[in-house]
Amino acid sequence: MSKQLDLSKRLQAVANLVSPKRRVADIGCDHGYVSIYLADVRKCPKVIAMDVRKGPLSQAQNNIHRFGMDDRIEMRLSDGTALLEPDEVDTLLISGMGGRLIMRIVSEGLDRLGAFKELVLQPQSEAELVRKFLREHDYIIVDEDFVIEDGKNYPMMKALHVSCLDEWDRESGQQHDAFTLFDYSVKQQDLFGPVLLKKRPADFCTFLDQKRKKTEEILQQITQPEKRKEMQDYLQQLIDVSKGM
């Protein structure tokens, strides 16, 4: 590829979570830049760029052609994983969607196709529900990142099916058991991310600080007892996990 592809901070972080040389389905590919990056830089031998809308898929196709990647990336007009075949990809990548939609797409894929080796997810909302969903469906979060871009918070995660953990240990040189954090409750790990709590990237620490201050402000305005108790509990969670900063 002769042209230079510059990804946004968020998309670069998402792309970096995809393991190199894997077959990838990019669900909701939008403009196709991540698919192009994966095929070129991450050396993924098979990339399927998928979107439910004709407009974004057409734009992605134009970009893929512009970067000379027509023979490296396949395009499919598909609602989620509907047009994927069993064992066609190793990695399912979904970014820029709400948490509940991501869970629905993954759940439908698991029901129809069986377990994917790797899930790379960037939920725009309800990341804690996505983490809980992964845990309940035999996926272990082995890496995470957190990006603040244009004033918006973007958590993202890589999860492997339990059947693939030994393979990941060998390839990465890490032990997945190292991500078990006994200092934090399951609730705290779901809320804030087990690997984020361990790695503490700069944007994540900024998020925790801003979230704590905002929660304190909101708490002063709440008078309804149940809502106040709920907000106090959340503030305490923030204070507890922030102690490691």
Functional labels for PLM-detected ranges:
Residues K46-D51:
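Conserved SAM-binding motif I beta-strand of class I
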Residues E88-G96:
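Short SAM/SAH-binding signature in class I
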Residues K54, S58-D87:
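S-adenosyl-L-methionine
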Residues S2-L7, R100-M245:
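Class I S-adenosyl-L-methionine
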Residues L5-K21:
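Conserved alpha-helix/loop element of class I SAM-dependent methyltransferases that forms part
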Residues A39-D40:
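Gly/Ala-rich phosphate-binding loop of Rossmann-like dinucleotide-binding domains
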Residues K21-D30:
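Conserved class I S-adenosyl-L-methionine
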Residues G32, I36:
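Glycine-rich SAM-binding Motif I of class I
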